[in-house]
């Protein structure tokens, strides 16, 4: 019996689990105990794109704009904005009552410093920076953007969830963008309790009593954020069986990523709700290192893409229910504005094993090792890794599998060292599927070298086409460029698409007000 089968049968049979403390319920203290995808190693949502950090940071930090359930950007920290000079000047005004968790008021210069830090690290932020003449704070309430070229998607970009354009005090925003901030001080509805953090065990967030919510009804990340409980605990439980058993027993309240094979068992429990929260899903991918080793060779990357059967990967990730995934997919997510069929035969009609071996030989591959970082503590990434590694080995690729936890990979993937000095070749990841909608927001298509996301591809042709897409006002020309950028990606392989998966969450039925959108959020949620 495989591991998943063992876990499923073990839960059904009531196998022994470690005892877990009950969350505080009743009286003056109400705690939601949430089991995230993996260990929380940093709260800096600019420094990393880790999903666990994104979800935790959303409680603590705010953004100038937030997206509603339909992903429309709405004012959040700003009261509103005006656009003048044919789109070249944006003036944003902060709303009243904004205060950081250290007691200081939020002022415009905090926002300017925070946004400049974000623009250094984020792909779309870099695009804005390229089009920016000046971002200034003429007074405590006002931000003024002076652009070289119009950028109508500015509010949408500032509302993105990963990497997030979080606003922090100026003293923290002045931290080197490639180093972690020393503190997690935001202005959101919950504050981070650094003194109670235990790596690999828990992270604590407390209601911020001085938070001033917007007056509008909440919809996902737009409107009035209201903390309805006193505390949220992120409890780290790497073992899927233990986590599911704890939820079934009422020892925890919410599983972000239950093992797909355990969904049936969880659905059978009277106190458990199994439902989608992230209704847009996740884009599973492999990211190759474009600087060092065999994966720096585009021919090798094309052969590796050809070796992957997306349906096999998604079946391993989500189990046998095809309604929970879409595969095969290209470099844009199906149903988004830029999705197209250009080059899709590369993933729909895969070459034979012998043909893939011939591709490797033609690329000059001679059995050099590929270091694959395999996160065994992440349910979905673990499954992606296992299928991908087996597929690569099957066509003769020498894979050195390095099994570790996701937190270690989040830190290690920042290294640009060669393989012989502890570097890496590839790792799996999940990106917010809703962002892979066009060449602007599909940031991992970018070929801007050392400024690109981990893996650091350099592709001037892709950058030229991306800029042309942004400058165009002709929908037909943009459609042509959608196809051209996808064809280019099939040639250069900035990342390897594995499919789109739509995992449901599982939570206790006494949690009410759980919001749907593009990620889990903890405001508006009550616990009975």
Language-model segments: which ranges?
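Surface-exposed binding/hinge segments that line
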Residues: 93, 127-198
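Structural transition elements
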Residues: 190, 323-362, 378-383
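Ligand/substrate-recognition segments at binding pockets and active sites
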Residues: 199, 239-242, 258, 353, ...
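Ligand-site clamp/hinge motif
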Residues: 213-265, 398
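Periplasmic-binding protein-like
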Residues: 265, 291, 295-336, 383-384, ...
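Extracytoplasmic/peripheral linker and loop segments enriched in polar/acidic and small residues
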Residues: 347-349, 400-411, 439-509
């Amino acid at each position: 019996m495989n591991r998943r089968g063992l876990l499923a049968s073990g839960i059904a049979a009531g196998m022994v689990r470690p005892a877990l403390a009950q969350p505080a319920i009743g009286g003056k203290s109400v705690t939601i105990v949430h089991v995230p995808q993996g260990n929380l190693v940093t709260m800096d949502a600019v420094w990393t794109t880790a999903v666990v950090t994104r979800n935790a940071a959303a409680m603590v930090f705010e953004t100038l704009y937030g997206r509603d359930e339909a992903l429309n950007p709405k004012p959040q920290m700003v009261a509103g904005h005006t656009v003048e000079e044919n789109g070249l000047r944006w003036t944003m005004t902060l709303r009243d009552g904004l205060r950081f968790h250290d007691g200081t008021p939020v002022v415009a210069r905090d926002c300017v410093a925070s946004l400049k830090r974000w623009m250094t690290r984020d792909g779309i932020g870099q695009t804005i920076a390229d089009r920016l003449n000046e971002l200034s704070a003429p007074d405590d309430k006002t931000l003024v953007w002076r652009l070289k070229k119009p950028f109508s998607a500015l509010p949408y970009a500032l509302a993105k969830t990963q990497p997030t354009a979080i606003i922090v005090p100026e003293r923290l925003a002045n931290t080197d963008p490639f180093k972690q901030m020393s503190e997690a001080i935001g202005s959101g509805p919950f504050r981070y309790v650094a003194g109670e953090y235990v790596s690999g065990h828990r992270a604590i967030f407390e209601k911020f009593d001085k938070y001033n919510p917007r007056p509008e009804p909440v919809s996902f990340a737009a409107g009035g954020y209201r903390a309805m409980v006193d505390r949220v605990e992120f409890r780290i439980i790497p073992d899927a069986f233990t986590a599911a058993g704890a939820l079934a027993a009422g020892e925890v309240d919410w599983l972000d990523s239950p093992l797909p094979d355990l969904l049936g068992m969880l659905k059978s429990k009277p106190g458990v709700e199994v439902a989608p929260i992230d209704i847009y899903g996740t884009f599973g991918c492999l990211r190759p290192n474009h600087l060092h080793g065999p994966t720096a060779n585009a021919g090798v990357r094309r052969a590796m893409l050809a070796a992957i059967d997306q349906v096999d990967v998604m079946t391993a990730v989500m189990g046998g229910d095809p309604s929970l995934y879409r595969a095969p997919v290209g470099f844009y997510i199906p149903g988004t504005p830029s999705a197209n069929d250009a080059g899709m035969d590369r993933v729909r009609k895969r070459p034979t094993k012998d043909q893939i071996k011939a591709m490797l030989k033609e690329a000059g591959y001679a059995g050099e090792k590929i270091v694959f970082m395999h996160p065994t503590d992440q349910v979905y990434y673990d499954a992606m890794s296992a299928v991908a590694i087996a597929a690569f080995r099957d066509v003769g690729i020498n894979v050195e599998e390095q099994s570790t936890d996701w937190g270690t990979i989040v830190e290690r993937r920042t290294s640009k060292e060669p393989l012989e000095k502890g570097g890496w070749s590839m790792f799996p990841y999940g990106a917010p599927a809703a962002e892979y909608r066009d060449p602007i927001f599909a940031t991992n298509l970018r070929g801007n070298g050392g400024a690109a996301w981990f893996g650091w591809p350099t592709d001037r042709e892709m950058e030229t086409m991306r800029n042309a897409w942004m400058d165009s006002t002709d929908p037909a020309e943009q459609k042509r460029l959608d196809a051209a950028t996808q064809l280019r990606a099939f040639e250069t392989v900035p990342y390897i698409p594995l499919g789109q998966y739509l995992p449901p969450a599982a939570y206790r039925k006494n949690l009410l007000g759980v919001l749907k959108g593009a990620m889990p959020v903890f405001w508006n949620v009550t616990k009975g």
